[in-house]
């Protein structure tokens, strides 16, 4: 741990087109090998497709999809007397966003189908699924909540 006190989180600048921090974070999650312009094309294209299919503004549709993906509870390991318990805990707001974005991009990358789908198509389909509360990323959130519910008996071990 640093001796100078807690480390302040860096401020993330909003993206140039939508002027939104969440879009910038999504671009950074999609980016591979530092190819940011490619990641921007993928994210902006996916947002346009999402807006066309939902009939909402691209930014509103993205925010709703991410809101649907945010986990409320998760389990964290806690050692008590030689045994490790999975203790359900509330997820802090910053972690909710980072988990939601991670699950979204992971689900889009693992998404398969007939034909050669581009990452743009995969991401837009996964965003649309998240918007409608379905898909692999939503399944991941539900699994996390199910684990927390199953281990509710250990909730008194919170620290």
Swiss-Prot record:
Protein family (similarity comment): Belongs to the universal ribosomal protein uS7 family.
Keyword RNA-binding: yes
Subunit structure: Part of the 30S ribosomal subunit. Contacts proteins S9 and S11.
Name of protein: Small ribosomal subunit protein uS7
Keywords: Ribonucleoprotein, Ribosomal protein, RNA-binding, rRNA-binding, tRNA-binding
One CC-aspect GO term: small ribosomal subunit
Keyword flag tRNA-binding: yes
GO molecular function: rRNA binding; structural constituent of ribosome; tRNA binding
Cited function: One of the primary rRNA binding proteins, it binds directly to 16S rRNA where it nucleates assembly of the head domain of the 30S subunit. Is located at the subunit interface close to the decoding center, probably blocks exit of the E-site tRNA.
Record gene name: rpsG
Name of one Pfam family that matches: Ribosomal_S7
Superkingdom of origin organism: Bacteria
Species of origin: Sulfurihydrogenibium sp. (strain YO3AOP1)
Any GO BP: translation
